[in-house]
Amino acid sequence: MAMAAVNCLILVDLQAAFVSGPVAVPGATVLLAAATDLLARARQARSLIIHLQNDGAPGMEDEPGTSGWVLFVEPGAGETVIRKTTDDGFDGTNLGDILAAGRIRRLAVTGVMSEMCVSATARSALHRGLAVVLPHDAHATYDIPAVPGIAPAIPAAMVARVAEWALGDQLELPVTGRDVQFTAAPYGDLGEVSAKPA
């Protein structure tokens, strides 16, 4: 049975440091291919598009104003950029208000990190009664290093798989982003918004 279309795409922390250069996540190439395809089709369908941008602490790769903090994919006209300081894109931001104003009930999520910001944002959306689609190839993270006496190193792909599994049965989990279909946001173009954390 075909999956119902979504009318919103949330791109989580697709910032330069995490998807390009020496500290990019191991699965950056696959992630970017999936994310850019999702974005292109969401734009074509006139879905609501929201870019989350994390404001890291001083000295971190995503510290505001640094090259690593910049969004890797430039937002288009009419797309929303929401800056945040915690894993959950809803926490201290107007993301929930924007989704409500746009009458969004089904959304797709892509980005990093699988077990942190992607998971936290997807879980909050589910708790708000929204249908969430998270393509398996459209999120990524880092390896977890070994800790003597606790566990060996855990590969990033396994971390990502556990993260999506932990979101439970309500999550819709297509194998690839190509399985996701988009439709226009019912409330139309909300206009470009750039919001800093509250």
How would you name each of these model-derived features?
Residues 2-8, 36-37, 60-198:
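Active-site-adjacent betaalpha module
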Residues 10-14:
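N-terminal nucleotide-binding beta1-loop-alpha1 segment
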Residues 17-21:
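Short acidic, Gly/Ser-rich segments with clustered Asp/Glu that frequently serve as metal-coordination loops
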Residues 22-26, 61-64:
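Short, solvent-exposed loop/turn segments at secondary-structure boundaries
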Residues 23-50, 54:
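A short alpha/beta connector and helix-capping loop motif
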Residues 54-55, 112:
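Short, well-ordered beta-to-alpha junction loops that form the rim of enzyme active sites
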